Amino acid sequence: MEPARYIINRFVEELWNARRLDVADQIFSEDCVTHQLRSGVLGEPAHRGPQEMKEHVSGWLMSFPDLRFNIEQMIAERDRVVSQLVMEGTHQGTWMGILPTGKRLQIRLITIHRIANGKIAEDWVLVESLGLFQQLGAVPDTAELMRNFAQGADSGSH
């Protein structure tokens, strides 16, 4: 396996799926920058070195203790690795102000990781966040949103 692919495989399989938080020290640079794109909205880049990544993973696991990632596709080219992932877990702890629902969620992510000096130096994450909130019941499903939109358009209200 190519070194860049190996690092991302460790990120998914060891850090997330095996809950080995110490792996963050081995695979993340101290000055790693994360760019999040959630349902079309680009957030501010965030510093996420090894310690911040451990806290990030721990936070998700407190809310979704059975959380797992499955790599569906991975493409590596020079210092970049693009992955298509499926994240699955059961909502058992408060997450982003949403009380535990007991609902099982499954969402897709696309990630791009830039590797420098054998560590993750930068990443871009596209999360299907609308689907996530819909699965938790925090927002109406897409069909209901479209019905509401159509009714509003028909009545002239926006």
PLM segments and residue spans:
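C-terminal and inter-domain tail/linker signature
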Residues: 1-158
